[in-house]
Structures are given as C-alpha cells and as structure tokens.
Design a protein with these regions (language model features):
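Long, internal low-complexity/basic segments
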Residues: 138-155, 160-236
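Short intrinsically disordered coil segments
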Residues: 24-28, 112-119, 173-175
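Active-site-proximal beta-strand/loop segments in catalytic clefts of secreted hydrolases
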Residues: 13-15, 73, 101-102, 161
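Substrate-binding rim/cap in mid-to-C-terminal beta-strand-loop elements of soluble/periplasmic
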Residues: 1-48, 52-67, 150, 168
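Flexible loop/turn segments at secondary-structure boundaries
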Residues: 18-19, 78, 106-108, 166-167, ...
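C-terminal cap/loop subdomain of S1 sulfatases and analogous C-terminal strand-loop tails that border
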Residues: 41-156
Length: 236
C-alpha cells in the first residue's frame, strides 16, 4: 500500500541535473537507482537488471513515459508457521493500485499465534505498540484490526483518487473488471519478463532461507528446503 511504498526520493548531482530544484511526479522504483549510477559512470547496464535509468528525468525531458511502478513482498519477520513469508506483487499507476496475493490463506501481518513468531508476539510483522495492543484487544476497533491484521483476498484493486488510503477493494466490482484485468496482465507481463518464480513456476526459495536470530519460542524453526529446490538452485 502507499503508506509503505510511496516515499520521497531526493537526488543531488550538480553536473548531471538540468534545471535543478524541480519536483517530478514520475513513478520510479528503487531498482532504477543501480542502472542510473552505472549509466552516469559510463558503464553498460547488464541485461539482467530490470530497472530503468533515471537519466531522462534528470535531464529534464518532458516526454518521459513511466506509467507504472512495480512492488514485491516476500518474507520480512519470521512470524508464520515454518518461517514462511507473505508473497505478493503489485503494480501502481497514477490512478490505480493492483495487488496480487499469491497465498491468501497466510496471515499478511503474521500469525495470531505467538508460537509461530520468532519474536513470540502476535502479528509479528507489526511491531509492538500501545496502538497495536488497543486494536487487538478492544472490540470497538475490530474493523480496524481486521484491516491491519486480517487475511486478504487473492486480488486487490484501489482507485487512488477516491481512496488514497486503499481501504475499499474494487477487485470484484463489475465496473472495474476491465481495469483489473488490464493491470493483472501488465503485472504478469512484467513478472514474466523479470523471471519472477512466483509466476514462472520456478522454485521460490524465500520461504526456506535460514533465520539468523535466536527464536524466543522453543521449537520454532524454518521449514526445511525441499530436495528438488536445492538441486534446482545449485550455483554453477
């Protein structure tokens, strides 16, 4: 959601920025920074990089076409059974946010059971705070708690102009089906182009990476990586 992904980016480069002091509303990704640095240094950008250099924006070009930003999430804190993450991908345009949750049966904010969290806290993706405690324990805030911690559908679609905080999911609304299908296809095309294993069917190893933090709950551990995954990802 925008609350976690829409962040400011400030760049200072006296020799490389034309008409400095500008504010650009172009959609960019962190993955665009590496090719920007390489291009600025006169180094060829490897084909494996999926980001696009920001040189056109820095040079003040007005016909820049950056119509979408792509977002991904896998595992953050170890707060689900077996150390699994919450795989999702998203596409953000100037008008819409479309999210694909690949395993909607998992808890997006972490399990409500302490035993599944490496830190032994409920909904471990959200750090402890008085606000979190009140939301979990006070019945009158049940709706807010569900928005923050509850399970989510396989697809989410939000109209930014009418819903800046992304609270009203339009993915199943008839009048937005064409928009949903178009954004779904754009996201799929990007994931295929970038070789994302969540879409290509290749082994997705994020759920099996080891955790290097001592668990507070006895017996907590990451699920072992399947043998076929180990063979598929041997480094040559």
């Amino acid at each position: 959601y925008d609350a976690g992904t829409h962040v400011p980016l400030a760049i200072r480069w006296p020799k490389g920025i034309r008409t400095p002091g500008r504010v650009s509303h172009s959609l960019v990704n962190l993955s665009d920074l590496a090719p920007t640095f390489l291009e600025a240094a006169g180094i060829s950008i490897p084909k494996m990089m999926t980001g696009k250099a920001l040189t056109d924006i820095l040079q003040g070009k007005t016909n820049v076409k950056r119509e979408a930003a792509f977002i991904a999430m896998e595992r953050h804190a170890g707060c689900r059974e077996g150390g699994k993450g919450y795989p999702c991908r998203a596409i953000r345009t100037k008008e819409y946010l479309y999210i694909r949750n690949f395993d909607p049966d998992r808890w997006p904010a972490g399990s409500p059971e302490r035993k599944h969290c490496v830190r032994h806290i409920r909904y471990g993706e959200v750090d402890p705070s008085p606000t979190k405690t009140v939301m979990m324990d006070e019945p009158k805030y049940a709706k807010l708690a569900d928005l923050a911690f509850g399970k989510r559908p396989a697809e989410e679609l939000y109209l930014i102009s009418n819903d800046p905080h992304q609270l009203r999911n339009l993915a199943d609304a008839k009048e937005f089906q064409k928009t949903r299908d178009l954004l779904r296809q754009q996201l799929d095309d990007h994931l295929k182009k970038s070789g994302d294993p969540r879409l290509t069917g290749k082994p997705a190893l994020w759920d099996y990476y080891p955790f290097y933090r001592a668990p507070k709950f006895p017996g907590w551990k990451v699920a072992p990586m399947p043998a076929e995954f180990q063979k598929a990802h041997k480094v040559k």
